[in-house]
Amino acid sequence: MQEQISRRSLVLQSMAAVALAGSAWAATAAQPSSVTVHHAKGSTEVVRAPQRVVVFDLTALDAMHTLGLPVAGVPKAQLPDYLSSYAAPRYTVAGSLFEPDYDALSRLRPDLIIVGGRSSAKYELLSKLAPTVDFSVRGTHMLEDMDRTVTALAGLYGKQAQGRALMDQVRSEVASLRPLASRAAPGVLLMAINDKIMPQAPGARFGFLFDVLGAQSLLTAKDVPARGGPAFGFDDLAKLQPQWIYVIDRNTATGSAPGGGAIVPSTQVFDNAQVRSTPAGQKNQVVFLDPKGWYLMGSSGPTAMLRNVAQLKQVYQAAGQGQR
C-alpha cells in the first residue's frame, strides 16, 4: 500500500513538473522575438536581447556600459577612462568613429549596429548589413534624446526599471545644478585647438552648458565668427571681459593635433596676459572642462553627463554658490 502511494506521488510530481515547464515555455513563447526601436532615422526591428552588438557611437556606448549591456565591437577611438576596458582585444575593432571596417563587420555578423553623431552618415550602408539604429543626440534636446536611447536599450534587455532609475538620477543631478549655473555671471565657452580658440554659442554643438544647465552666455549665435570668417583671438576675448571662461581642449580629447604637430595643453595656452586681464582670470574662474567628456562624448552619455555635472557643481560651489 505504501509503495502504491509513493508511486502515485512520484507520478503526480512528474506531471506537475511537466505542467510548470509547459507554462514557462508558453510564457517565453508569448514574448515577441523582436522589438521595434525608435531612433533618429525612424524605427527598426531588433531581435530581443542581442548579443553581437557593434557600437560606433560613444554616447550610446556610455549608455550600454552604464546599463551593463553586452558589446561585441567598437570603433578605434580615444575613450574616457570609464570606457577604457573596451580597448581590450576581446572587443572587435569595427572601424573608426567615421568609417566602418566592413570586413570586420562581415566576420562578426552583428545582430545590431548602433550609430550616432559622427557615424550617423553611414546609417544607410550599415542598415543593409544588419539591423541598425541611429541614436544621434540633438544639442538642444539632450535629455529627451538620452532618455530615448536609454529607454530603448533598457527595453531590449528587459531592464526597464534600471533604465528609469538611471534617467531619474541624471535628471535629478541636472536639476540640482541648474540654480547654480543660472546664477553664475555670464561667460564664454571656447573650444581650443592649441592656440586657436573658437567661441561656442547657445543652441550649438556644446549646448549642454547653456541650453540644458541654463548658464548665461556673453555671446549669441550671431556673435560667433562664421566658418572662413575673421578668427576669434585672445584680444577679442579680453575685450569681452567675461566673468567665466569655459574651455574644451580638443587636442587633449583626441590625443592629436592638426597636421600631426605637438599638443599644447590649454592650461598652458590660456596662461597669458589677455586672460589674466579678465575678471575670469583674476577670480580663478577659467574652467578647463573634461576634454573627453565634452568633446568626444558631448556630455550626452549618461555617465559623461553625470561626471560633467559633478565637475561644474564643484566649481560653482567653490566660487560662492555660483553667484559671482
How should each PLM-predicted stretch be described?
Residues 2-17:
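N-terminal secretory signal peptides and thylakoid transit peptides that target proteins
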Residues 4, 22-34, 43-44:
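C-terminal segment of N-terminal export signals and the immediately downstream linker at the start
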Residues 52, 58-107:
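A short, structured surface patch at a secondary-structure boundary
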Residues 52-56, 60-64, 162-219:
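Basic- and aromatic-lined ligand-binding clefts that recognize polyanionic substrates
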Residues 109-115, 131, 241-246:
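Proline-aspartate-enriched helix->loop->beta-strand connector
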Residues 121, 136-152, 185-208, 253-256:
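Extracytoplasmic ligand-binding site segments that recognize negatively charged/polar headgroups
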Residues 198-201, 225-257:
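Ligand-binding pocket segment of bilobal, Venus flytrap-like solute-binding proteins
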Residues 249-324:
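Structured C-terminal subdomain patch of bacterial secreted/periplasmic proteins
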